[in-house]
């Protein structure tokens, strides 16, 4: 893969007093770019994002990608009016803070149930995207809608929505593990999304459960995926996203994506 590879670290499991030392360790593996974690957004302390940015700078790291706040009350398909307003407000504040970090993509979950139909959520998705895109544009960050646990039909319609919206600050995040276990497979799902993929979440599984394994611990054809990634017209970078984010896992990703 010719584009930059960004490494995911599960920062929410790391004590505050260990964050900087872990950043230094990760940098010693050859990592230069890390995924900015949503746990760094604290509603009672907005300055914490700046603190983390300073840690990264001191460790010789940068962050070009961020996973949006996610889960109940944070996802795109939030139907309660007050909850939706609060959700949009949080994302806007986080995006404003991320502009100081240098983040370029912000991956956003739909939050739809697996069997949900696009027609039932389309208006809410559009409403949320409409609300966030001006903030994304102001901060030069692309909003990337992710294929999560939804059906292949919904992913096709979401992809058509993004294509029809045709906005430079709206794209898609292709999650290879989700494609492998929830949709029609990696190649097939990537082809559906290909024209507007701006970032990727890469991890492995055997096609039956969303394990978030490093390469080699599943049935993903990494050689094929590596080739496919270089054909994506809007791809800015790709992100590792395995639960095992240690040094061996990092080097496994580098090996299969020819980053060594």
What are these regions (language model features)?
Residues 1-4, 10, 16-30, 57, ...:
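Histidine-acidic metal/acid-base catalytic patches
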Residues 36, 64-68, 103-110, 143-145, ...:
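Short beta-strand segments at enzyme active-site cores
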Residues 63-69, 108, 196-206:
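Non-cysteine beta-strand/loop elements that form the S-adenosyl-L-methionine
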Residues 47-51, 83-91, 119-130, 159, ...:
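Charged helix-capping and loop-helix junction motifs
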Residues 39, 71, 111, 205, ...:
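Flexible loop residues that form catalytic
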Residues 1-93, 99, 254, 258-260:
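N-terminal pre-domain/capping segments
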Residues 72-79, 112-119, 181-182, 207-213:
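A short acidic, helix-capping loop that chelates divalent metal ions and anchors anionic groups
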Residues 16-20, 57-58, 77-171:
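Active-site acidic/histidine proton-transfer and metal-coordination neighborhood
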